[in-house]
């Protein structure tokens, strides 16, 4: 929910201000354009990101969020910000259901922190869920398995092996998608030096065990209602094969640390204590078992007596209370002691001692979440992790027994510990210490923490860090051995250093040779401390960015791949929501009506689907580009496409910047920031050549629409729209994998340049996802060169798709209505909605050049502004058209820009409906086939490359586009012209 109490109402209940004191570093206020209904639906993260953007150097006016805003990478999607062209920055942060084809032997991590070989998943007796990364929420999650399939390997098909810097290895088919900081990239397209996102936890192998832990006979002495409650939740009988065993072991471990089982008002209850976030995670586990629990937060006085003195004060106490007597009794049967634990003898339950290793892992992870210390570092070295428990003096022996039981469990994971007593005036206190880097690494990689978010994220980050440190030390040790061998053979320090120069410096080699070797290898001086590593590499939820150190194609030594279908996938705005993708939308009008098209609508969709290549690098190729031709696309965009016969010269007058960013930047005198053809790596060229002229998947689409309602008849007529029922065509796609690759090649440069920005402007960037470069620097110019080259690719892509769509209409309706010209198929407008552009705007009464970032936002210029920037005026006497796609089941809009938008939002408005539900959530909730059937019932036909994509784009997954448009209209930053409704949808 939004922090509504912080928002200041400006006007019309659709314009709101986020004050500068929301975050101390804000240089300007935030400005939110949304109805109260839309405000209520915005994640708090949107407002935090608005505030973070307001902290960037050189920002003017406001950090803006439009009504379709939702949480993004760095900037909110639906965000706008303008920066001084001399004293500001450019930031890439401003501008899904996957089937994975994996090699046998691949380890798949489950919800319980254990792994299963992919080929063994169908054989498992349990229905454990798999662990996934919910990108929307920045946290791990779990998902049910939809299916596990196997397929034979095709003749001459190769596999790809990818190795990261910490040693993580994955092998799969070339089209297996891998998550990178910029989104999903196919395994076959990853290169050495690329970055990928990993989950740094090894876990232990899943092991099945037969038999029963508890059954009805264990509850013969209790009220039958207790047994009924447990049976209704499938908690009795409790068998080893039930995945709930892992959850119960976790809960029991935490309860033995921070839980209390006792009577309250004569009723047995179970309570847990701790940090609110920790208890909310625990509450999720309880609810997954069907057990209700309530959080209670209160202030309380405390008194603590330690060896060093007595302390008292006030603290906030948080309790998670389970009212169910039945569940409390179940926990008691599982070994939870009744009464004050400090005064009650207990031990590690026998069933835990007898359990498979993965169950023991969950018990320990819950226990250490409660009573274990968080991992800490002294620069490069981890400090001991301690488990602390106390008893009254009479129970010292019982305490030692319990701690020794825990030590024995840890030893089964290869983790050695030390037990020692801590001085205490009141009770006997013992600490079980995990000491030594190897032991700590094993604990973090195999056991770790559950529930406590801080401990868990720190633990995951620490494990990744220690694995990286281990690999670096190993490389340096091998370099020392190699250097010594080369020196012995050649007698040359120079040759010895040349042999290992990519790993160590010359001084290291000299020490190896002259000092008789190196007794113990340490990390180099420039190796990051743990704190710096976290800052640079760790994402929300403990996921970590790692560099790929090896990629190789291999001949499979097996005869089949395995495919996993899950009901959860990562939200793809990490890829699509950044500048580099330059997504955009185009609308064309026709002189046909719905009555003309409806009888042959299905045939039309089939024809478009056949003529317009879809998907990820569709095999159906209409164009085969040479490298030189692709370089021409990078420089000239849609103009290149028209010269090659894809469309007409008149089309260019209805495209933002005539579809040619070279011309646009030459016109305004900033040609050094325009596109260049030398910014593309070999890999970008390889990706771009086959994908030009393809629609793409995800939220990319081609729709056949009809005019549903006309609001401004004069403006509509100037656009060629005369009546309701008239057919239009909307194309939504972008720069495909080429844009991703070109700009991701430059992203690491931007990340490095951020330190220069902080030094230059004396600021601290509040979010590392706001990587940026100071305008005027080579890094900023190169980024613009790359981004504008990708923009040209996108303009050319939409131009080619439009041409083939015209041909499809002629193929289906030509005999009856003539050629494309006879049918009046003309471009109304084509505009990008993920771009940063250099534009001139008034600031404090003075015209200034600004860098305007529009992420998931659309330019909405007045006619005067178009002329000032040398932009084509598509319709004389009208502001620039604005195209707002909705969802498949409702509609889209054509708006026009306003003077109010020029004054307040740098000539910007919303770009679409905006999501309310992640793709993962949509696929959990909807079946693509059901969505398609329901749309057909409404008169909307869908032709898609896959049904999961249809599920992702289900209408309920989006905000109400009518509400979004109402917000910008009432705010005065756009005026509605027509509403369009879909009748046919083509998706890649």
From Swiss-Prot:
Segments forming domain DOD-type homing endonuclease: 251-415
Organism listed in the record: Methanopyrus kandleri (strain AV19 / DSM 6324 / JCM 9639 / NBRC 100938)
UniProt-listed PROSITE patterns: INTEIN_C_TER, INTEIN_ENDONUCLEASE, INTEIN_N_TER, UPF0027
Gene: rtcB
Processing after translation: This protein undergoes a protein self splicing that involves a post-translational excision of the intervening region (intein) followed by peptide ligation.
InterPro entries: Hint_dom_C, Hint_dom_N, Hint_dom_sf, Homing_endonucl, INTEIN, Intein_C, Intein_endonuc_central, Intein_N
Location of the active site: 911 (gmp-histidine intermediate)
Leftover remarks: Ligation proceeds through 3 nucleotidyl transfer steps, with 2',3'-cyclic phosphate termini being hydrolyzed to 3'-P termini in a step that precedes 3'-P activation with GMP. In the first nucleotidyl transfer step, RtcB reacts with GTP to form a covalent RtcB-histidine-GMP intermediate with release of PPi; in the second step, the GMP moiety is transferred to the RNA 3'-P; in the third step, the 5'-OH from the opposite RNA strand attacks the activated 3'-P to form a 3',5'-phosphodiester bond and release GMP.
Note describing how the cofactor binds: Binds 2 manganese ions per subunit.
BP-aspect Gene Ontology terms: intein-mediated protein splicing; intron homing; tRNA splicing, via endonucleolytic cleavage and ligation
Keyword Hydrolase in annotation: yes
Residues that coordinate or bind Mn(2+) 2: 583, 732, 833
Cofactor(s) needed for function: Mn(2+)
UniProt xrefs under SUPFAM superfamilies: Hedgehog/intein (Hint) domain, Homing endonucleases, Hypothetical protein PH1602
Protein's name in the database: tRNA-splicing ligase RtcB
Assigned protein family: Belongs to the RtcB family.
Quaternary structure note: Monomer.
Family annotation (CDD domains): Hint
Function of the protein: Essential for tRNA splicing and maturation. Acts by directly joining spliced tRNA halves to mature-sized tRNAs. Joins RNA with 2',3'-cyclic-phosphate or 3'-phosphate ends to RNA with 5'-hydroxy ends.
EC number(s) given by UniProt: 6.5.1.8, 3.1.-.-
């Amino acid at each position: 929910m939004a922090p509504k109490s912080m928002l200041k109402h400006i006007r019309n209940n659709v314009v709101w201000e986020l004050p500068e004191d929301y975050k101390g570093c804000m240089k300007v206020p935030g400005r939110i354009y949304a109805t109260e209904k839309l405000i209520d639906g915005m994640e708090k993260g949107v407002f935090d990101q608005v505030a973070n953007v307001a902290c960037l150097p050189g920002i003017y006016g406001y950090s803006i969020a439009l009504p379709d805003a939702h949480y993004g990478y760095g900037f909110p999607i639906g965000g706008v910000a303008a920066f001084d062209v001399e004293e500001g920055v450019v930031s890439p942060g401003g501008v899904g259901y996957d089937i994975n084809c994996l090699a046998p032997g691949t380890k798949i991590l489950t919800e319980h922190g254990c792994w299963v070989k992919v080929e063994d998943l169908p054989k498992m007796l349990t229905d454990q869920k798999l662990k996934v990364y919910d990108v929307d929420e920045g946290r791990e999650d779990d998902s049910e398995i939809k299916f596990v399939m196997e397929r034979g390997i095709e003749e001459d098909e190769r596999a790809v092996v990818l190795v990261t810097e910490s040693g993580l290895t994955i092998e799969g088919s070339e089209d297996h998608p891998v998550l990178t900081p910029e989104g999903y990239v196919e395994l076959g397209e990853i290169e050495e030096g690329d970055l990928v996102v990993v989950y740094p936890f090894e876990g232990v192998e899943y092991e099945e065990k037969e038999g029963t832990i508890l059954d009805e006979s264990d509850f013969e002495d209790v009220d039958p209602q207790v047994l009924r409650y447990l049976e209704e939740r499938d908690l009795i009988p409790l068998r080893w094969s039930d995945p709930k065993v892992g959850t119960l072991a976790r809960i029991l471990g935490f309860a033995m640390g921070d839980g209390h089982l006792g009577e309250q008002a004569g009723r047995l209850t179970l309570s847990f204590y701790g940090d609110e976030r920790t208890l909310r995670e625990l509450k999720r586990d309880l609810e997954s078992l069907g057990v209700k629990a309530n959080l209670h937060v209160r202030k309380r006085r405390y008194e603590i007596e330690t060896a060093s003195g007595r302390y008292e004060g006030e603290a906030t106490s948080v309790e998670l209370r389970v009212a169910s007597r039945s569940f409390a009794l179940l926990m008691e049967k599982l070994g939870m002691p009744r009464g004050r634990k400090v005064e009650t003898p207990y031990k590690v339950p026998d069933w835990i001692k007898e359990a498979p290793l993965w169950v023991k892992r969950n018990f320990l992870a819950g226990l250490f979440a409660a009573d274990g210390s968080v991992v800490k570092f002294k620069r490069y070295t981890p400090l001991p992790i301690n488990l602390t428990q106390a008893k009254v003096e009479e129970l010292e022996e019982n305490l030692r027994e319990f701690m020794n039981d825990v030590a024995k469990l840890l030893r089964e994971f290869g983790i050695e510990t030390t037990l020692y007593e801590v001085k205490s005036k009141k009770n006997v206190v013992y600490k079980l210490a995990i000491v030594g880097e190897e032991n700590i690494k094993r604990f973090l990689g195999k056991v770790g923490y559950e529930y406590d978010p801080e401990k868990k994220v720190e633990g995951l980050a620490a494990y990744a860090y220690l694995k990286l440190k281990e690999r670096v030390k190993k490389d340096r040790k091998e370099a020392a051995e190699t250097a010594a061998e080369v020196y012995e053979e050649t007698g040359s320090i120079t040759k010895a250093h040349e042999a290992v120069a990519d790993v160590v410096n010359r001084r290291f080699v000299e020490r190896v040779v002259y000092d008789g070797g190196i007794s113990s290898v340490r990390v180099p001086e420039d190796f990051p401390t743990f704190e710096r590593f976290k800052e640079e590499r760790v994402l929300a939820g403990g996921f970590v960015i790692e560099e790929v150190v090896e990629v190789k194609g291999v001949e499979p030594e097996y005869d089949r791949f395995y495919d996993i279908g899950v009901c959860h996938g990562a939200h793809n705005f990490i890829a699509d929501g950044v500048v580099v993708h330059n997504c955009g939308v185009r609308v064309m009008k026709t002189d046909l009506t719905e009555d003309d098209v409806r009888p042959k609508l299905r045939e039309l969709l089939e024809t478009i689907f056949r003529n317009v290549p879809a998907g990820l690098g569709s095999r159906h190729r209409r164009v085969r580009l040479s490298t030189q031709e692709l370089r021409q696309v990078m420089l000239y965009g849609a103009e290149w496409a028209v010269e090659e016969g894809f469309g007409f010269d008149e089309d260019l007058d209805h495209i933002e910047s005539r579809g040619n960013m070279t011309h646009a930047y030459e016109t305004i005198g900033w040609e050094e920031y325009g596109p260049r053809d030398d910014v593309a790596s070999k890999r970008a060229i390889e990706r771009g050549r086959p994908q030009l002229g393809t629609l793409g998947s995800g939220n990319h689409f081609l729709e056949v629409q009809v005019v549903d309602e006309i609001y401004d008849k004069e403006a509509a007529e100037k656009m060629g729209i005369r009546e309701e029922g008239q057919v239009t065509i909307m194309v939504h796609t972008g720069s495909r994998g080429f844009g991703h690759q070109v700009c991701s090649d430059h992203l690491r440069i931007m990340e490095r340049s951020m330190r220069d920005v902080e030094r230059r402007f004396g600021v601290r960037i509040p979010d590392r996802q706001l990587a940026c470069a100071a305008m005027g620097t080579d890094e900023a110019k190169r980024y613009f060169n790359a981004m504008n080259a990708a923009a040209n690719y996108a303009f050319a892509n939409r131009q080619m798709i439009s041409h083939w769509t015209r041909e499809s209409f002629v193929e289906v309706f030509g005999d009856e209505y003539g050629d494309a010209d006879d049918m009046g198929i003309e471009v109304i407008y084509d505009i990008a909605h993920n771009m940063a552009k250099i534009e001139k705007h008034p600031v404090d009464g003075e015209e200034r050049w600004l860098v305007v970032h529009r992420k998931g936002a659309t330019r909405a210029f007045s006619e005067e502004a178009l002329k000032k920037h040398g932009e084509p005026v598509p319709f004389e006497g009208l502001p620039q058209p604005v195209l707002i796609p909705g969802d498949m089941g409702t509609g889209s809009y054509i708006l026009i820009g306003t003077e109010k938008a020029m004054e307040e939002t740098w000539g910007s408005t919303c770009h679409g409906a905006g999501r309310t539900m992640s793709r993962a959530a949509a696929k959990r909730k909807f079946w693509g086939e059901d969505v398609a059937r329901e749309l057909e019932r409404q008169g909307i036909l869908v032709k898609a490359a896959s049904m999961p994509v249809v599920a992702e784009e289900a209408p309920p997954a989006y905000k109400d586009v009518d509400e979004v448009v109402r917000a910008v209209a009432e705010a005065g930053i756009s005026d509605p012209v027509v509403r369009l409704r879909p009748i046919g949808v083509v998706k890649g």
